[in-house]
A protein has these predicted regions:
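Sec-dependent, cleavable N-terminal signal peptides
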Residues: 1-8
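Extracellular carbohydrate-recognition regions
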Residues: 8-34, 526-554
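Extracytoplasmic
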Residues: 8-161, 605-607
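Surface-exposed, low-complexity/disordered Ser/Thr/Gly/Pro/Asn-rich loops and linkers
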Residues: 38-55, 255-263, 565-584, 600
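Residues within well-ordered beta-strands of beta-sheet-rich folds
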Residues: 74-78, 120, 129-133, 147-149, ...
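Glycan-processing catalytic domains of CAZymes
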Residues: 157-538, 542, 550, 605
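Surface-exposed, glycine/proline- and aromatic-rich loop segments on solvent-exposed faces
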Residues: 537-617
């Protein structure tokens, strides 16, 4: 069945053709809203309407498009999509007619972030019915308008990543991060071997890693700044707009910023995190361009000899989302064997979190599945958030915990923040009480008492949440809202935020230091190397005199990459070209009169200033 929408006479192929002026459209039901539900309000310049396809391979017909006698060689369209996989096929005369071109839509960042993208077409003249058909669309792709070109355009090209398996005996450089001595902002020491004991086998830590920082256009809204400017009437952005709860230490970045990805990988590996768990739980959207950029960067780091966490996917708790994502990820990743070294394995198969109860055996047998949702525990569950004392998931026996969760905070709507303790969120939270991270400490202490195989930590880098209009009586920050007040669910401000990634506000790296502390208590830590007596070093003699000096301190090499990346919402370009000293090895020696310092640089370029604090260990 075809649905007539509007009748056209002749359409000039070289003028702007509004996508909503189609003459017919395929009859696929979208979101249960009816067969003609292809239109929505467009936030592109000029407003109006746009058409969209939501995972349904929709097509639109434009009748009597006149290409004239001077042939068209190109196609240009105003599109929005964040999947990086949707194709828009250009077909002549019937839906089964010749395909004259395919626009491979490159992610624009968000569903209403618009870009003009182009592709060449088979030279075309005369009058034709034109069909535009979306294919391979794992998310939501939208079209505002299009036109044809007399010239061959520069084709919009998706990023591609090369891959060759690492050697079977590959081992990364061991910098012994579990032996590093550290003190946090509160003056509390991070656990070492004396407190944590020796390393324990079969203990793993995963952390939720989010993929929401995608926007190339728009405004940056930061609730911490807005509340500071006007606490009682903050100037929030438009409804359903992402707001940061605070500013990341790396500025307002996008998930494809490789400078940030590299530092995330080092921070997490050094803290003892084994696996980053990509949050693809949102209605089956794969966020492909973003996790692909992250995974490829992790692979590049391993090629350079650097250790990194591995990865897995969280596909939500709905069967529809898990079914779509399992099929998509199998086809585009796991069946190819690509990045196999980075797959996090559980019971001999790649771990996937999701609801596999209605999944075909073809995919169910490829992965080890565990259900994973907030406040849920029990058989074959990997909970990601719970109230203290947290429940746990089990596999072999209900008496043997397999996995439990630890969260930094919960939700602004449930009024459970960083200071939540004993079932109560304090009425008057200060920076000092927030910085104590009471909820985080209590959750870790209970998780340690359970002693499972796996601890799922929430979270690393969510950073944003959308603002919504409240219904009468909506809970938010411990009070009832009036209708149409604004509220936020997951993230709101420093107290109600779950991100362990360091911020540039008063929280700094406190949560990160506590993460490292408790992971050592869970997994154990190697002993710090002991100093082996005094050594007198002559500056005029060979470096070989340092060979017997212990301990040695090692740094990751190749980690002084520069930065030049578009910021979130395109508000600026983030540039950092300060990388110089690529430290390799450091040692300290002493005798009765002097201290001696040895610094080896990977790139033979050193500018060093020493600020020495001598203390008794």
């Amino acid at each position: 069945m075809m649905i007539p929408v509007s009748a056209a006479q002749f359409i000039n192929a070289y003028e702007t053709i509004q996508a909503e002026n189609y003459s017919e459209a395929s009859c696929a039901s979208v979101l249960g809203l009816g067969s003609t539900h292809y239109l929505e309000n467009c936030l592109d310049a000029g407003g109006g309407k746009n058409v969209f396809d939501w995972q349904r391979n929709t097509y639109f017909k434009y009748a009597n498009v006149d290409f004239g006698s001077d042939a068209a060689y190109g196609f240009s369209a105003r599109v929005a999509d964040f999947s990086d996989h949707a194709d828009l096929k250009i077909i002549l005369d019937s839906i089964n007619g010749p395909v004259i071109g395919t626009l491979h839509i490159v992610s624009t960042g968000k569903q209403q972030d618009w870009e003009t993208q182009s592709c060449p077409i088979t030279p075309t003249s005369g009058v034709h019915d034109v069909f535009l058909k979306f294919e391979n669309n794992p998310a939501k792709a939208s079209l505002n308008y299009f036109t044809f070109l007399h010239t061959v355009p520069e084709e919009t090209v998706r990023p591609t990543y090369s891959y060759e398996p690492l050697p079977a005996n590959w081992q990364g450089r061991d910098t012994r991060p579990d032996t590093w001595v550290a003190t946090d902002m509160l003056g509390e020491a991070v656990a070492d071997n004396r407190l944590a004991g020796n390393p324990r086998s079969n203990k793993y830590v995963g952390i939720f890693y989010h993929l929401f920082l995608t926007r190339k256009q728009g405004e940056v809204y930061d609730n911490s700044r807005l509340l500071e400017e006007n606490y009682f009437d903050p100037a929030y952005g438009p409804v359903n707009t992402d707001h940061f709860w605070g500013k990341p230490i790396f500025d307002y970045y996008r998930n494809i910023d490789t400078y940030v990805i590299r530092r995330h990988a080092q921070l997490l590996y050094n803290a003892g995190v084994d696996v980053i768990i990509f949050d693809t739980s949102n209605a089956g959207f794969p966020f492909a361009p973003y996790w692909m950029a992250i995974v490829d960067t992790l692979y590049q780091m391993r090629e350079e000899g650097l250790n990194t966490p591995q990865f897995a996917f969280h596909t939500g708790d709905g069967t529809d989302g898990t079914n779509k994502l399992a099929a998509y990820l199998y086809k585009n990743l796991y069946s190819t064997g690509k990045y196999r070294e980075l797959w996090f394995m559980w019971d001999g198969k790649p771990l996937m979190l999701g609801n596999s109860t209605q999944l075909s055996a073809q995919y169910r047998n490829v992965f080890t599945f565990r259900r994973s949702w907030a406040w849920q525990s029990g058989e074959n569950q990997f909970p990601w958030l719970d109230n203290t004392p947290q429940g746990y998931g089990w596999n072999e026996s209900a008496d043997k915990p397999e996995a439990t969760s630890v969260c930094l905070a919960q939700h602004a709507t449930t009024n459970k923040g960083k200071s939540y303790s004993g079932g109560v969120e304090p009425a008057n939270v200060s920076e000092e009480t927030t910085l104590e991270l009471i909820n985080f400490r209590e959750q870790w202490e209970h998780a340690l008492s359970l002693d499972p195989e796996f601890i799922f930590v929430t979270a690393w880098n969510e950073w944003v949440a959308s603002n919504y209009y409240a219904a009468e009586g909506q809970d938010f920050l411990g009070r009832k809202l009036s209708a149409n007040d604004y509220y936020f669910v997951d993230e709101y401000n420093p107290e109600f935020s779950r991100d362990i990634e360091p911020s540039d506000g008063f929280l700094g790296d406190e949560a990160y230091m506590k993460l490292a502390h408790y992971i050592r208590l869970f997994k154990g830590a190697r002993a710090v190397g002991a100093a082996n007596g005094s050594h007198t070093i002559s500056i005029n003699e060979s470096f070989a005199q340092w060979d017997t000096v212990e301990p040695a301190f090692y740094d990751s090499v190749g980690d002084v990459t520069h930065r030049n990346e578009l910021a979130y919402a395109g508000y600026t370009t983030l540039v950092n070209q300060s990388g110089r000293n690529d430290f390799d090895t450091l040692k300290v020696a002493y005798d009765a009169e002097n201290l001696y310092f040895y610094v080896k640089s990977f790139n033979r370029f050193l500018i060093i200033s020493l600020d020495v604090l001598i203390c008794r260990y």
